[in-house]
Regions:
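C-terminal catalytic/motor cores of large multi-domain enzyme assemblies
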Residues: 1-282
Length: 282
């Protein structure tokens, strides 16, 4: 998917940096005591932004030879989010139907995913998705793509080795609600990754992330950092002080979107970070 992404998608990106000082203080005083993590709150904020800019939440099909294609947007927001397995490996999880979930529901959903990860065989899970994608490509007439995937998966030094016999039977006997299945790691409608949760306090800022086809957008949440900034105090006066800033990267497929199409997303984030009281209604 990574090689296909860079080969077929004309990537463009915008880096958004928000002063979240007041937002962070409100979160610590009113939301964190309820057991809700900052990652969950930021995920909710991104979801609200996506709802305000539905063009982001979609898939594109494009025929390069005929120079034509179609874009399909979705009401359901199914988030592809990379998460670290107990083994230390990375797996992209599909967080289904996050468009209307409350903070509490989002938090419990993510905790349940982490619980099920403990009994999940990464190779088996990824192979099931790969075969499903391959069959889907075959149904669309993509014979060369299908053959390439099958040959790559089953031959050579890097072939996929799945369990067999008794081991496979034992793994398949684990109830679906106790492990992650194909439905949990299949393609979502949009990708959100949080590098800030992996390396807190990092001074890095992402400049680009890959858009996974057929998705048309990907969001990267960076690490919160202290910086001098200009803000308005309670008396309405401009001041300079140490503030907390959050970088957010939005990468998109330029065939489907222009920067102007994305302004509703950024304006919604502006509103959320300026009036954190709305978190109480989430």
């Amino acid at each position: 998917m990574t090689s296909e992404s860079w080969r077929t998608i004309p990537h463009s990106a915008a880096i958004y940096e928000a002063d979240i000082t007041d937002f962070l203080e409100f979160f610590k005083a009113n939301i964190k005591p309820k057991g809700i993590t900052l990652n969950t709150v930021l995920l909710k904020a991104m979801t609200m932004g996506i709802k305000n800019c539905p063009q982001m939440n979609g898939h594109i099909e494009f025929n390069r030879r005929l120079v034509r294609g179609k874009i399909e947007t979705y009401k359901d927001i199914n988030i592809s989010m990379p998460m670290i397995m107990p083994s230390g490996d990375m797996m992209t999880i599909n967080l289904h139907n996050f468009e209307n979930r409350t903070l509490e529901n989002m938090q419990s959903y993510i905790l349940d995913v982490k619980r099920r990860m403990k009994k999940t065989d990464l190779t088996e899970a990824m192979f099931s998705v790969s075969m499903s994608d391959t069959l889907s490509a075959l149904k669309k007439g993509k014979l060369i793509t299908t053959l390439g995937r099958l040959i790559g998966a089953k031959t050579g030094r890097h072939k996929v080795v799945t369990s067999r016999g008794k081991d496979k039977k034992n793994y398949n006997s684990i109830p679906a609600d106790e492990r992650l299945t194909k439905e949990n790691i299949e393609q979502g409608t949009i990708t959100i990754t949080s590098t800030g949760s992996v390396y807190r306090g990092s001074h890095n800022t992402m400049s680009v992330i890959e858009v996974i086809p057929p998705q048309i957008s990907a969001i990267g949440i960076g690490s919160i950092s202290e910086k001098p900034g200009i803000y308005t105090d309670r008396n309405g006066e401009k001041q300079i002080g140490i503030r907390m800033f959050l970088p957010v990267l939005l990468a998109f497929d330029h065939r489907a979107l222009d920067f102007g199409d994305l302004t509703p997303f950024f304006k919604k984030l502006d509103d959320i970070f300026a009036t954190p009281e709305q978190m109480l209604k989430w």
